[in-house]
Amino acid sequence: NGCYAYRIEHEGKALVFSTDCEHYEDRPNKNLIKLCQDADALIYDAQYTEDEYHGLNGQFSRKGWGHSTMREGVKVAEAANVDKLILFHHDPSHDDNFIKQIEAESRQLFPQSIAAYEGLQIDLSQNELPKSLFD
């Protein structure tokens, strides 16, 4: 468990990039939450669904593989008071329709979220996220 994460600050804006970030099962990662505190955007490794990660509903478990889930990204974003959540590191087995479903679920939990896609540009000075590729 653990992750690499980077916080980039410039002209009063903050972006956190959290790659290959497997969450703890029993508690939030306090170091990650501290790093993300009040960031304008968090780019979070959301490679798996809950079923895939935990090995439920016919899936095999991906625990210990070094990746996380959208729901864990939402938890971090909420705990750290992040403005925007960008889900990335999509599993290669997930097609666009599958990612669209994950993004829709994420938006129900954290409205300012988007699934990353090639060419996505985020302007931290804007309050709203750009249009989703999956809308």
Model-derived regions: residue spans:
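Short hydrophobic/aromatic beta-strand or adjacent loop that forms the aromatic wall/cage
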Residues: 1-5, 119
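Active-site beta-strand termini and strand-to-loop segments that position acidic
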Residues: 7-11
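Short proline/glycine- and acidic-rich turn/helix-capping motifs at secondary-structure junctions
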Residues: 121-123
